[in-house]
Amino acid sequence: MISDIRKDAEVRMEKCVEAFKNQISKVRTGRASPSLLDGIIVEYYGTPTPLRQLASVTVEDTRTLKINVFDRSLGPAVEKAIMASDLGLNPSSAGTDIRVPLPALTEERRKELIKVVRGEAEGARVAVRNVRRDANDKVKALLKDKEISEDDDRRSQDDVQKLTDAAIKKLDAALADKEAELMQF
């Protein structure tokens, strides 16, 4: 029972860490990355469709993304969707391809993005702590029903705290990496 609670908490904490890493991968840095356009939704014959289903996105150079749209008639719709996003990008058509140059980030914008990333990190830490609280509550319920001893309760809480500390350490490491990436010129 306790091992199931521990495993469940471990899996949920790992999901929190992965969700945070996925979230911050979408924050624009000075470098081009195809994941930057993952959140772009294009109107495809009246249906909102993710860009990655309609085109391939590759890195042309460190500051340019190249989009190869599968259906040529969608070029203007893709450009419009990118411009409408809050990424501050201006795509340009070049025949069948669309190129998206990434402008250099200003110091002010970098600091703003760091604040956003730190806010995301705090949200992820709260999620990890909520998982810890849920696991500890389940163990306390077992103790209350006299299914486990107080020693098992204490041991389980210590294990869950170690998992929490490890997950928060991973979050902090990912945050530090992203901050360093954002501050590079």
UniProtKB/Swiss-Prot annotation:
Its main location: cytoplasm. GO terms for molecular function: ribosomal large subunit binding. CDD domains: RRF. Belongs to the RRF family. Gene3D superfamilies: 3.30.1360.40, Ribosome-recycling factor. It comes from Enterobacter sp. (strain 638). The keyword Cytoplasm applies. This is Ribosome-recycling factor. It comes from the Bacteria. It holds the Pfam family RRF. It is found in: Cytoplasm. One of its GO terms (biological process) is cytoplasmic translational termination. The gene is frr. GO terms for cellular component: cytosol. The keyword Protein biosynthesis applies. Responsible for the release of ribosomes from messenger RNA at the termination of protein biosynthesis. May increase the efficiency of translation by recycling ribosomes from one round of translation to another. PANTHER family: MITOCHONDRIAL RIBOSOME RECYCLING FACTOR PSEUDO 1, RIBOSOME RECYCLING FACTOR. Keywords: Cytoplasm, Protein biosynthesis. NCBIfam families: frr.
